[in-house]
Amino acid sequence: MSTSAPAALRKTALNAVHRRLGAKMVDFGGWDMPVEYSGLIAEHMAVRTGVGLFDVSHMGDIQLRGPGSLDAVQHICMNDASKLAVGQAHYSAMLYPQGTFVDDVIVHKFSDNDYLIVINAGTREKDYEWIRSHAQPFHCHVSNYSDLYTQLAIQGPRAAETLAKLTSVDLAAIKNYRFTWGTVCNLHNTLIARTGYTGEDGFEIYIPSDEATSERVWNEVLEAGKEFGIVPCGLGARNTLRLESAMALYGHEISQDIDVFEAGLDRYCKLDKGTFVGSEALKQVVAQGGPKRKLVGLEMIDRGIARDGYRVLNDTQQAVGYVTSGSPAPFLKKNIALAYVPTELATLDREVFVEIRNNPVKARIVPTPFYRRPKKQA
């Protein structure tokens, strides 16, 4: 059986490395990506207890430069970028006029006239066109640098110790959602951001996307983290890690059919900053008393795994909602899920049912995130 990737799928610069490591490869949003190497549970636990290394080069990078770049970002994204300091990033989202999601993003402020928006892999082309078209009225230049960088995520409680071996940058000075430039693995002007999608401490670094450089840095990170039990990690562990941390995934918890209040992401939506795409529709949601449904966390009481799309039933066995993501939680050793239910049912400790193979299986609504990383000891 051939192990070569289908020609139609896009590849990161590390594709051959993943295959040599024996990774199980899958089609993820049109990309040939590793879903697991040694196994999902081992990779998940390495990130929770030590350190893991992810290739996340399929993510997109859109830069806005010019005197109108802040105004453009403010118009396109729901968070308030005027509050960002140089060297700071924040979580945000781009919305359709009806207040539903184009995509969720991370916005980085390079300078007063220079911003980077990191977008999701499966929506790269759509997102770029959305940003480009909506930035047109503003005095800024939009550039798609998605293919110029290999993006590596070094995640876990030993991530800082691992990366510290490869750079002279004072990593302790880079607080959560902050970034700087420095030399990593002898590569100058490397972007080093204290960000991630795992619920753990960690860093994402951006390096040139040529295969030789990408492979060298990948191998040097693995060598640096060897004493901490580092393992290469695939998208499977990335998904269970983000689910334990109740982080949204586009196409599941957020989509063009789900609005900000339903998703519970209104803390990142600054309606008081002025008008932006989607703001008027969201003000109407507020005026009408809030959303009709809400995203909740579920913990299975009875045996069973709630999967994406499974129906949520009320106490009279009527379908009232649906599961957006569900899985065994390797670190928590529980079966968990995220689901949409009517607002009147979205109360903690309420028991509901998830329909699994035509059988109602009992679950409880619980607080999210399911997992919070331990606070560092003084």
UniProtKB/Swiss-Prot annotation:
It is an enzyme of class 2 (transferase). It catalyses: N(6)-[(R)-S(8)-aminomethyldihydrolipoyl]-L-lysyl-[protein] + (6S)-5,6,7,8-tetrahydrofolate = N(6)-[(R)-dihydrolipoyl]-L-lysyl-[protein] + (6R)-5,10-methylene-5,6,7,8-tetrahydrofolate + NH4(+). It holds the Pfam family GCV_T. The keyword Transferase applies. It comes from the Bacteria. GO terms for cellular component: cytosol; glycine cleavage complex. The keyword Signal does not apply. Keywords: Aminotransferase, Transferase. The glycine cleavage system catalyzes the degradation of glycine. The glycine cleavage system is composed of four proteins: P, T, L and H. Belongs to the GcvT family. This is Aminomethyltransferase. It comes from Acidobacterium capsulatum (strain ATCC 51196 / DSM 11244 / BCRC 80197 / JCM 7670 / NBRC 15755 / NCIMB 13165 / 161). The gene is gcvT.
